[in-house]
Design a protein with these regions (language model features):
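Acidic, polar-rich low-complexity tracts and alpha-helical solenoid repeat scaffolds
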Residues: 1-268
């Protein structure tokens, strides 16, 4: 719960060498497998989970093992094998496995473009749950890829209703507002795009992308002078960023559209 995963894994390994952790059933092994999986050691994690599939183990242990195996298969892109693993999970999983199973199914359905089935699960998730903003973001992205920008923006905007203020949530909020802005832009709703881009923090990780989009939304509305303000601010940032590079090309384009050819030539 403190996100000290390496320390937790180290303590588990030390405890195992000293005879194991008593009184916690199969939980230490499940956690150890999860840590190995998080560090990309899939073969070691898989060996642990497959060992937990023994029929003598409790059902909740086998459910957890199959769930983690399904996750690994999903991450490898083997969707058929993911479904096969999920079929082994009981109809009444317990504890955290319920939420993890639902979240995996949402992502699996999205990958298969079964958006209504994914949405049916997401609609049951409370705004208070930690996973909610990530599920909303994934649903929004899926609708945007299908060019259903209205639904995409609706899910992006759900994130604005959440009161979490951790840095992780604020970054996701910025990412959602930036993506919503581009969804409006692609849907030729330039004024709405501008309003979304304005909600992104100027010192956040998505500010460059938002400044670029803000400018293009103004260009689409033929407000070339207004486009220059965010682009000029962006052009003063690191040149390594592709958004900055695009802004430096976009600035002379805006001058050209304003029939200020000497300025355009100088900027080119």
């Amino acid at each position: 719960y403190q996100d000290q995963h390496f320390l937790a894994l180290s303590d588990l390994l030390v405890a195992e060498e000293q005879g194991g952790i008593k009184g916690h059933g199969d939980n230490p092994e499940i956690m150890m497998g999860g840590f190995y999986m998080a560090y990309g050691l899939e073969r070691t994690a898989s060996d642990i989970f497959e060992r937990l599939l023994d029929s003598n183990r409790p059902q909740k242990t086998r459910d957890a093992a199959w769930l983690y195996l399904a996750k690994m298969r999903y991450l490898r892109g083997d969707l058929a094998a993911t479904h096969e693993a999920l079929e082994h999970i009981s109809e009444t999983p317990v504890g955290a496995a319920v939420e993890e199973l639902e979240s995996l199914k949402v992502n699996l359905f999205i990958k298969e473009n079964r958006l209504e089935e994914a949405r049916a699960i997401v609609e049951k998730v409370s705004l208070r749950e930690d996973r909610a903003p990530y599920l909303y973001f994934n649903m929004a992205g899926a609708y945007a890829r299908n060019q259903n920008y209205e639904q995409a923006v609706a899910f992006y905007n759900r994130i604005t209703q959440m009161r979490q203020r951790s840095e992780a949530h604020l970054s996701l909020y910025d990412k959602a507002m930036t993506a919503a802005g581009f969804a409006h832009l692609y849907n030729q709703q330039n004024d709405l795009a501008v309003q979304q881009f304005k909600q992104v923090r100027l010192d956040g990780p998505y500010s460059n992308r938002a400044l670029l989009g803000f400018g293009w939304a103004q260009v689409e509305g033929e407000n070339y002078q207004a486009a220059l303000t965010p682009w000029q601010a962006l052009s003063k940032r690191t040149l390594i960023d592709e958004n900055t590079q695009e802004a430096m090309v976009a600035i002379p384009y805006a001058y050209e559209q304003m029939d200020l050819k000497p300025a355009a030539l100088q900027k080119y």
